[in-house]
Amino acid sequence: MECQRCPASARNPATVESRKEKFCDECFIKFVSTKQRKQMMKDEYFRNLFKVIYPFEKEGSVSKILLPLSLSDSGSLVMLDIVHDLLLEQTKQHNNRTGFTVDVLTVFTEENVSVIKERMESLINEKMSQLNKISNIFNVHFIDVNEFFNNASEVSTFIIDNENFEIFSKSKSVDDSNILTLKEILGKYCLNNSSRSDLISIIKTQLIKHFAYENGYNAIMWGHSMTKLSEVIISLVVKGKGSQIATFLDSESFDTLNNKPCKYKNLYPMKDLLSVEIESFLQIRNLAQFLINVEETNVKPNCLIARKSLPSLGQQKLVKNMTINEITNKYFQDIQNDYSNIISTVSRTADKLTQPKSSMAKPSQCQICQSKIYTNPSNWLNRITVTSPYPVETTEEKYLFKQWQDSKLGQSHTHYVELLNEIKQGASNSLDVEDGDVKLCYGCLILLNTSIKDKNLVWPKVDTMDITANATNNNKELSQILDQFEINSDGEE
């Protein structure tokens, strides 16, 4: 088989087959890179961010771009590789000048800090040091996921009244004796893997957006492929957060954080690429060596002709043990080679969605996920749900009720009622219609009601958070990492 994009007089052997077209390695790399660069030049705002602007002395001629890098995600790594090549081209064409600088941000946990340290050393030496010998183009930042809790001066305890779905909250100050951790939140409050996955995703996204807001970036480049975006879109619908889709995909408006306007826009440069194409690019460019889950990455589906691979049966989870995100991921991974049109249909349809009309008296944002709230979820649930139990009457019913009270489930309910009454005493009802202060969106309300122990959750107050400009300085070990791998204009380590 021959590449269909090479000149007819010198066709190379085909190594990749995607979208019913055959590519050699060189043509496929160009195909993927062109798709990403096209999105980076999608409108005037982004064109001005990424192109070299003359004169160089003009204020704002060099843009600041934040690139969240997950070393367990192929998309963000491939995106960084293509951005690196673009910057290298600009330095050659414009006398060592570039139109933008890139700050790479990695959010880590205690469990993976050592392997991230090792992989980042290799990545910095191979992909960033060369350009930083010319100019200070790349900067690297690390944030401990627990900074989400450490940097809040206040936390709120949210609880749902299961009789009418009203939400009550109680705030308290944070000091060194009662700082929360991710491990504590996931272990103490979450009842299943789906709720753990949701909270981790919310925390990481908020850390990245706070970092961008506080450090004045012009754009955040997310490494979501078309497949990944479709997974997120369907997951949002399933979780009751479909109203967030339009905002999530919005690359035309400046973002908002805690009802405050931001100076950056969100960009998805990989949105025209399937995840199998990204995995194939990763293998061709030998980038898997930088990921912390190399073995898992090597068995992911791709569109390489000679090296197609599928997960073995031993690696597959039972559906009942999978999170919502994992179920949607499995579905789209299974169909993308043969039915990629389904994925593109989901993505294109979502792009056409607009934000719902709000029925709120004033703009409100969810205190957990920071999404916009368009209607009062508690009122709607109260209208369609019967929560009053049937009264206990017969001797048998009284006996069974007593057994239930003595069970773990009954004791848990008793603890929930006591906690609800305690919070109610000093808390104002969040559903005051005139005040319009609705604290949770529908999706987070359902999460709290069904997947969180005792229907209550302690969460940092976003308006009291302060993710510092140099987050790594808050952690001694990672400060040492940055010192060791510091990349500067002289190219010295």
UniProtKB/Swiss-Prot annotation:
Pathway: tRNA modification; 5-methoxycarbonylmethyl-2-thiouridine-tRNA biosynthesis. InterPro entries: CTU2 (IPR019407), Rossmann-like_a/b/a_fold (IPR014729). It is found in: Cytoplasm. GO terms for biological process: protein urmylation; tRNA thio-modification; tRNA wobble position uridine thiolation; tRNA wobble uridine modification. GO terms for molecular function: nucleotidyltransferase activity; sulfurtransferase activity; tRNA binding. One of its GO terms (cellular component) is cytosol. Disulfide bonds: none annotated. It comes from the Eukaryota. Gene3D superfamilies: HUPs (3.40.50.620). The modification Phosphoserine is found at residue 489. Keywords: Cytoplasm, Phosphoprotein, tRNA processing. Plays a central role in 2-thiolation of mcm(5)S(2)U at tRNA wobble positions of tRNA(Lys), tRNA(Glu) and tRNA(Gln). May act by forming a heterodimer with NCS6 that ligates sulfur from thiocarboxylated URM1 onto the uridine of tRNAs at wobble position. Prior mcm(5) tRNA modification by the elongator complex is required for 2-thiolation. May also be involved in protein urmylation. Belongs to the CTU2/NCS2 family. Interacts with NCS6 and URM1. May act by forming a heterodimer with NCS6. This is Cytoplasmic tRNA 2-thiolation protein 2. It comes from Saccharomyces cerevisiae (strain AWRI1631) (Baker's yeast).
